[in-house]
Amino acid sequence: MRIAYLVNQYPKVSHSFIRREILALEREGLEVTRISIRGWDNDLVDEADLAERARTRYVLQEGAVSIALATAFAAVTRPRAFAWALLLALRMARRAERSLPYHLMYLAEACLILRWLRQAGVAHVHANFGTNSAEVAMLVQALGGPPFSFTVHGPEEFDKVPLLGLAAKIRHAAFVVAISSFGRSQLLRLVEHAHWGKIQVVRCGLEQTDFETRSDVDGSRDLVCVGRLCEQKGQLILIEAARRLAEANVDFTLTLVGDGELRRDIAALIDEHRLADHIRITGWATAAEVRSHLLRGRALVLPSFAEGLPVVIMEAMALRRPVISTYVAGIPELVRDQEHGWLVPAGDAEALAAAIRRCLDSAPAELQSMGRAAYARVRAQHQIETSAQQLKRLFEAGASEARSSQTG
């Protein structure tokens, strides 16, 4: 069976979980066509991402002429389907964040993608994120293409539910994937009970090799925070917590691994609080470099304000590192307070500082016990082969149902 993965930007530094999923599906025997709207010129640091870029077709890279010709061809050869897809695009634009011309462009992109899918013999399209890629997949189906599904990761999708038309996308999809029970609950709120059965939880998973490193916590005083430097990850609160620790003469260092739009603000706050001796920012890192930082660290700290379920938490737990994080979204489904680390209320710098101090004051034996429990927990819940098998069954069922409806 051949499927297509449709993503707005792929590969991307923060989208390693999509790459991991695609490769696991291929090991399960599926053929996967990679299609990305844009991103062929993204800055990439990981060799695996560079290899994926070479396997990916980029819609906008084809140019306006190719897209226009594909649109004209679809309008002439399948006028009824094109009219239905156009009506659907107009409906999606009615309350959308972006204006009508964007949605007409999504329709044009869908026309080109439809041609590619027919040439490749694709039986199902899966979009990652409930944003424009899911709308394009929906329009491909409306044009007469294969059934589609999409994964909602959060948190951005949940911030813009009406603007993204998530409810309409769910109603038209063969199925929808949520990466946590919390995520599923938010999607259930959007649609009638008749559609609830199509919303399935498939957790992101780690590779078998991610579980093979055996390294317990030693006497390190370094705390590691991995993630895009942005408002939802809560690094500004982490700097405030670090200030409290420094003022109390607590011995620690903090490594911020990542980059993003708040880097300048975070760096300014570090300077304002005179924390340069305690905190450093590395910028973007490869998967191997992230792993190295986690192994050198005492614990992962991720003080998120909004999340889906961060893959880096899984990676840290697989390396037997305790996790300090927040009671947000899917995080408590994986991390249990006092068992695998510490959970605190989001936005509470005092509670975060207290949790970090408890971690720093804990004996290595206690941290090692937490690390082993974390390892067992993530291994039981987040193996990529299990996730790929779940997805494969869903893809096959969706394609089978589509064939039955066509013959019936």
Where in the sequence are the language-model features?
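A conserved mid-protein helix/loop that constitutes part of the nucleotide-sugar donor-binding site
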Residues: 16, 221-244, 250, 254, ...
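Nucleotide-activated donor-binding/catalytic signature segment of Leloir-type glycosyltransferases, i.e.
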Residues: 267-285
